[in-house]
């Protein structure tokens, strides 16, 4: 019996375009396919060796025994590499028309013109467009697609690649390491502070597609950078897989903010590994917005290696019908006087399931370290569920740990108060939800906050009745 495509409903990015790819690998994962990917990219031998070792690890490693249901994920039915065009273009006019129309619908050219210092657009397996303001190059900033960085900055690339997330980290990190393609590479030199965001946009267009970008960010001593990524995919009757790896190195006194606003269709498995090493007095901020997908499993991680290092995660997860958002954070305190903050906001409706899963670890050398965790969940109906699963490891007695968790429903008193002032029940519920997520949206640049609020409103439509 043929599968029915999920209802597009109000998912505004559910459109898909005709296949315009110039190359598409066979479905399934084999040594031949991994070798073919590497040869098409004309990679050095060491990268091919890295990929093949990762593939062997992937075969050996077990599937996660926790989190959402992965039993329907068929690795043999996925296309692991699709090349949409011949080159990464620096001019928007030179991007193939079919691909350009997709990104025009998503507002990428407009976004670049208005408020971005640099932008990268990935379609399927490859970055099809990349541009950066010239003055940033003059400051020594490197912002390239990851494949170009491997070719053009190999020494710097090799120094940091897989140093934060090795292939052996987990099964999906091994998978990414074997078939990675695209992503962003950023290097910010010492004491260079970049205030305007750099942005990347990742789009899956094909059915049964796997997207495996690899992002690597290095903020040198005293540097600062703000990076924003967005993700969407069409609605199909069969599943797609997004399995990215993000590695970030925050050197002494440096600052990195990494913002994600994902709005995947509800046929996408979103299984991502994100980790940063934070050195002395460095500061790492994860700002993570999770909407859509069939299943998201994502836990941004800060490893606080230097004295005074700081890490924070501010996240929102919204699960609707048939969706599981299994998200959270990991804070690993390895040095004295380190600090971390986790603020998790979750919303579930129409039978959706949200799970906060977090780890805070205090090592023996982490004297004077402190961590604060806040988990708030808003459940909009009786069919939806929420779980909070914290795990704390403490190996010294000179630390501070605070954890607060709260689950609530939209109360009749709140609704009555608003409805008595002429507001409909649906509008009142929406107002309560928007107030609930305000601590998240206020941390976004204005244009992203507007988009996030709009996406939440789309998700909210039809919540009453």
From Swiss-Prot:
GO terms (BP aspect): iron-sulfur cluster assembly
Recorded superkingdom: Bacteria
Family: Belongs to the iron-sulfur cluster assembly SufBD family.
Entry-linked NCBIfam families: sufB
Protein name: Iron-sulfur cluster assembly SufBD family protein SERP0500
């Amino acid at each position: 019996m043929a599968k029915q495509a999920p209802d597009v409903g109000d998912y505004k990015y559910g459109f898909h375009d005709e296949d315009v790819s110039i190359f598409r690998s066979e479905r399934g994962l084999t040594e031949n396919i991994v070798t073919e990917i590497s040869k098409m990219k004309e990679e050095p031998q060491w990268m091919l060796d890295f990929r093949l070792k990762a593939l062997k690890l992937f075969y050996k490693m077990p599937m996660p025994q926790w989190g959402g249901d992965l039993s329907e994920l068929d690795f043999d039915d996925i296309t692991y590499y699709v090349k949409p065009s011949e080159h990464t273009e620096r001019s928007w006019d030179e991007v193939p028309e079919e691909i350009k129309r997709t990104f025009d619908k998503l507002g990428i050219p407009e976004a670049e013109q208005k408020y971005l210092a640099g932008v990268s657009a990935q379609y399927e397996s490859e970055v099809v467009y990349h541009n950066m303001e010239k003055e940033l190059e003059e400051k020594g900033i490197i912002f390239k697609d990851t494949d170009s960085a491997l070719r053009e900055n190999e020494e710097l690339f090799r120094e940091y690649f897989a140093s934060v997330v090795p292939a052996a980290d987990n099964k999906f990190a091994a998978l990414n390491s074997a078939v990675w393609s695209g992503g962003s590479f950023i290097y910010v030199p010492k004491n260079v502070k970049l205030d305007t965001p750099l942005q990347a946009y990742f789009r899956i267009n094909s059915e049964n597609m796997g997207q495996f970008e690899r992002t690597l960010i290095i903020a040198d001593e005293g540097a600062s950078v703000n990076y924003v990524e967005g993700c969407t995919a069409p609605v199909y009757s069969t599943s797609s897989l997004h399995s990215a790896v993000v590695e970030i190195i925050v050197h002494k006194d440096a600052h990195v903010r990494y913002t994600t606003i994902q709005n995947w269709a509800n046929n996408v498995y979103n299984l991502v590994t994100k980790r940063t090493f934070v050195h002395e007095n460095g500061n790492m901020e994860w700002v993570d917005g999770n909407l859509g997908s069939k299943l998201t499993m994502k836990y941004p991680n800060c490893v606080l290696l230097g004295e005074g290092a700081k890490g924070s995660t501010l996240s929102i997860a919204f699960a609707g019908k048939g969706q599981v958002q299994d998200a959270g954070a990991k804070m690993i305190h390895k040095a004295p006087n380190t600090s971390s903050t986790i603020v998790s906001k979750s919303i579930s409706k129409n039978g959706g399931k949200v799970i906060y899963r977090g780890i805070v670890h205090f090592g023996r050398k982490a004297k004077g370290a402190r961590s604060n965790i806040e988990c708030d969940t808003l459940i909009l109906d009786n069919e939806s569920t929420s779980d909070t699963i914290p795990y704390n490891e403490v190996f010294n007695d000179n630390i501070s740990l605070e954890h607060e968790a709260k689950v609530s429903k939209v109360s009749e008193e709140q609704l009555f108060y608003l409805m008595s002032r002429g507001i409909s029940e649906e509008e009142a519920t929406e107002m309560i939800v928007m107030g609930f997520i305000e601590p998240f949206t206020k941390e976004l640049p204005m244009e992203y906050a507007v988009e996030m609020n709009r996406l939440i409103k789309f998700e909210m439509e039809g919540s009453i009745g």
